[in-house]
A protein has these predicted regions:
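Short, flexible, basic/aromatic active-site loop/helix in glycosyltransferases
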Residues: 2-7, 13-35
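Terminal low-complexity segments of carbohydrate-biosynthetic enzymes
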Residues: 112-182
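A residue-level structural signature of the nucleotidyltransferase/glycosyltransferase Rossmann-like core
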Residues: 41, 63, 81-82
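Acidic donor-binding loop at a coil-to-helix junction in glycosyltransferase catalytic cores
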Residues: 60-70
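Hydrophobic residues within well-ordered alpha-helices
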Residues: 73-75
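Active-site donor/metal-binding and catalytic loop motifs
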Residues: 84-101
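Conserved nucleotide-sugar donor-binding
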Residues: 37-53
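A structural signal for short, well-ordered beta-strand segments and their strand-loop junctions
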Residues: 1-2, 82-84
C-alpha cells in the first residue's frame, strides 16, 4: 500500500498534498494502471517481502528507484499494490534544494529502473511533471527555509507538536472513545 505525502517544509501544505495525491493517483503507475509504491510512504506484508527479497535488484551504482523496483517485483509475483488517499506521510522537500544536474540524475532513475525491467511498461512518465515543477519549487524552497529560520520554526517539530495537541483534545472531547481504543 502507498499514499500521498505532504511536504512539511514547504508552504501551502494543503495544495502540495493535493498535487502530490493527483500525481501519485494518476501517473505513478505501471503495467495497465498498477500502483507503484512510494518508498517514503509504503507498507508491504512480510509474506510479500519474503517472496521477492531474493530477487530485488541490487543497485551498487545507485541509479534506480528501489521503491519502483520493489513494486515491479511484487507485480511479477501477482501481488496487488493499492493506493490509499488516507495513508498520508510527511516528508521533506529538500530534493528541491539540489542543483538541476543532481535533480536530473535523480529523475533518470525512473528510466533506469524500467530499463532494468523490460517486461514492465508505463503509460505516464511521472518525471515529466516533476521536471515542470522543479524550477518553481527550487526557487521557493530556500526562500521558505529562510522564512522558517527567521521565525525560529522547525516544521517537523511543529507538526509533531500539533499532532500531540490534537490527540489530547480528542481525549477530552471523547474520553470514552479514546479509552476504548487504548
Amino acid at each position: 500500500a502507498t499514499g500521498p505525502v505532504v511536504y512539511y517544509d514547504m508552504p501551502a501544505k494543503g495544495a502540495g498534498l493535493a498535487g502530490d495525491d493527483h500525481i501519485r493517483r494518476h501517473t505513478y503507475r505501471a503495467d495497465n494502471d498498477q500502483v507503484l509504491l512510494f518508498g517514503s510512504n509504503m507498507a508491504i506484508r512480510a509474506s510479500a517481502w519474503h517472496a521477492i527479497s531474493g530477487e530485488v535488484c541490487r543497485d551498487p551504482e545507485d541509479v534506480m528507484h528501489e521503491d519502483i523496483d520493489v513494486s515491479l517485483h511484487l507485480l511479477n509475483h501477482g501481488f496487488k499494490t493499492v493506493y490509499s488517499q488516507c495513508m498520508i506521510c510527511g516528508i521533506s522537500a529538500r530534493r528541491m534544494d539540489t542543483s538541476f544536474a543532481s535533480f536530473h540524475r535523480y529523475m533518470q532513475r525512473f528510466k533506469n529502473t524500467f530499463a532494468a525491467h523490460p517486461d514492465h511498461w508505463r503509460e505516464h512518465h511521472t518525471e515529466r511533471r516533476l521536471y515542470a515543477l522543479y524550477p518553481w519549487l527550487h526557487m521557493l524552497y530556500p526562500i521558505y527555509q529562510q522564512h522558517l529560520a527567521a521565525k525560529d520554526i522547525n516544521p517537523a517539530e511543529k507538526i509533531w507538536f500539533d499532532e500531540q495537541i490534537k490527540l489530547v483534545k480528542s481525549h477530552f472531547d471523547n474520553p470514552e472513545q479514546v479509552d476504548a481504543v487504548e
